[in-house]
């Protein structure tokens, strides 16, 4: 890690405070810079679905990465292993399956699907299709 655990915890608290101000209960961050800022994750894997997921009351964010990139998450982040969420390679390029199908499953399993979810709308590789999967699973959501 390039920064201390205390630095990462302080960053998380700042983000969570801003989430409260904006009424966001769950933040899905796809931008690699922001993932690094929040978790320390540092890998050349931006071209596949990945994100940091911040719950407004959580002690740590989640890091959502494909199986092949999980090693980088275990090495470069401060996160507990249970907060590194790994999706199987069979979600990649197997239409109609998509990694965000698994992400939505995780959100539902944690009973976060009814929360006010915020996403970064200007991140490379976060496509309109990715957003539609989140919206399909959350029919009451507004863009």
Where are these regions (language model features)?
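Terminal domain-start leader segments
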Residues: 1-59, 108
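A short acidic, often aromatic-flanked loop/helix-cap motif at beta-alpha or helix-coil junctions
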Residues: 89-96, 141
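Single conserved hydrophobic/aromatic residue that forms the stacking wall/gate
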Residues: 134-143
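Hydrophobic alpha-helical hairpins/lids featuring a short glycine-rich hinge
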Residues: 95-125
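Structural motif
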Residues: 32, 65-68, 119-124
